[in-house]
């Protein structure tokens, strides 16, 4: 009599299900390979949509074959190189393969590539030059509004300032004494420029007016009409009798200085043209706009040469180096340096977290940036090193919120910095004559790499 092992109903059901899975699961639980990898759909699309281009035309196929053959002919043969080991136990089984020929190790060791032990030259950083710190020299009062524009005369005898009180004032640069006040604008004066070849002073303002003042008679002799809104900036071409203006209507206009005719209308910006600069070589006009772009213009054709879109916020100011073929642009919390004429990016000036309203650079490679909160930073132009950071002081009787830098420029020698501020004063700064590299050392240490963007 056969004896069957006693099992519970649950165990019997579990064994039956397990046996069923062993018998049939291997066949029915697997996904068809063609369905899993989608080969059915791909083969259908190849046949239905790409059957006409399955084979290249004979001319194109022959051209590609020649190009592939030429590439194989130019490629050097790579052969594994082995050498006897030091203990004489046969050839080394090193996995390093080198091109046929003498080893490129140099004096650093036989067969040892120098690139593995030396830092690439691209990451080596130049040590910044020493610059003396700057200190306050003079405070000039007289305006009744924010000082929004400054311009220094070519002979370095006087400078002009334009402010929110709708006046233009001429000041003695050596003494700070007021020499003249020009009235004529009916709104804030936003831009000033002194001609190096004529006794002319040009001004623009939020009243849509662009005026030419004769400094021999102290009267307006020309008006330039065409802007549809406030004019925020202007610049003179260094060699040609051309005036360039830009404003809230988003265009830059090129004027013939003498005939008042509008030569070009440089349109392309989608926001206010906050600043523009002119230079002799291409690009002869550079504009910065609140649409966060910088545009380089071909003056002869009146067209855009390039657009720089690296900034994330509106570009409020530009500065061109007086000797080098480079310039800088400033937006909120960001200053970038560019190389002309294509506008190749060079470096960032990092560390000024403010709305930067003013930029200026002198021949000694000192870059100044002024913020709307009164912060002032001085940089080494070559390396982007910030060697001084100070805060301006609002004049007594002003609010702390009025300690803002609205405009700035160096004089012709580069030894005086003039700033126009929101406390209605003009401040003149100079380098500290008593500072030495020992008393104010350069606290700089190289980093492994430079952040480009």
Swiss-Prot record:
<dbReference type="GO" id="GO:0005737">
    <property type="term" value="C:cytoplasm"/>
</dbReference>
<dbReference type="GO" id="GO:0000974">
    <property type="term" value="C:Prp19 complex"/>
</dbReference>
<comment type="subunit">
    <text>Associated with the spliceosome.</text>
</comment>
<keyword id="KW-0677">Repeat</keyword>
<dbReference type="InterPro" id="IPR015943">
    <property type="entry name" value="WD40/YVTN_repeat-like_dom_sf"/>
</dbReference>
<feature type="region of interest" description="Disordered">
    <location>
        <begin position="62"/>
        <end position="129"/>
    </location>
</feature>
<feature type="repeat" description="WD 6">
    <location>
        <begin position="351"/>
        <end position="389"/>
    </location>
</feature>
<dbReference type="GO" id="GO:0071013">
    <property type="term" value="C:catalytic step 2 spliceosome"/>
</dbReference>
<keyword id="KW-0508">mRNA splicing</keyword>
<keyword id="KW-0963">Cytoplasm</keyword>
<feature type="compositionally biased region" description="Low complexity">
    <location>
        <begin position="62"/>
        <end position="71"/>
    </location>
</feature>
<dbReference type="InterPro" id="IPR020472">
    <property type="entry name" value="G-protein_beta_WD-40_rep"/>
</dbReference>
<keyword id="KW-0539">Nucleus</keyword>
<feature type="repeat" description="WD 1">
    <location>
        <begin position="142"/>
        <end position="181"/>
    </location>
</feature>
<feature type="repeat" description="WD 7">
    <location>
        <begin position="400"/>
        <end position="439"/>
    </location>
</feature>
<keyword id="KW-0853">WD repeat</keyword>
<dbReference type="InterPro" id="IPR045241">
    <property type="entry name" value="Prp46/PLRG1-like"/>
</dbReference>
<feature type="repeat" description="WD 2">
    <location>
        <begin position="184"/>
        <end position="223"/>
    </location>
</feature>
<feature type="repeat" description="WD 3">
    <location>
        <begin position="226"/>
        <end position="265"/>
    </location>
</feature>
<dbReference type="InterPro" id="IPR019775">
    <property type="entry name" value="WD40_repeat_CS"/>
</dbReference>
<feature type="repeat" description="WD 4">
    <location>
        <begin position="268"/>
        <end position="309"/>
    </location>
</feature>
<keyword id="KW-0747">Spliceosome</keyword>
<dbReference type="InterPro" id="IPR036322">
    <property type="entry name" value="WD40_repeat_dom_sf"/>
</dbReference>
<dbReference type="GO" id="GO:0000398">
    <property type="term" value="P:mRNA splicing, via spliceosome"/>
</dbReference>
<comment type="function">
    <text>Involved in pre-mRNA splicing and required for cell cycle progression at G2/M.</text>
</comment>
<feature type="region of interest" description="Disordered">
    <location>
        <begin position="432"/>
        <end position="453"/>
    </location>
</feature>
<dbReference type="InterPro" id="IPR001680">
    <property type="entry name" value="WD40_rpt"/>
</dbReference>
<feature type="repeat" description="WD 5">
    <location>
        <begin position="311"/>
        <end position="350"/>
    </location>
</feature>
<keyword id="KW-0507">mRNA processing</keyword>
<dbReference type="Pfam" id="PF00400">
    <property type="entry name" value="WD40"/>
</dbReference>
<protein>
    <recommendedName>
        <fullName>Pre-mRNA-splicing factor prp46</fullName>
    </recommendedName>
</protein>
<comment type="similarity">
    <text>Belongs to the WD repeat PRL1/PRL2 family.</text>
</comment>
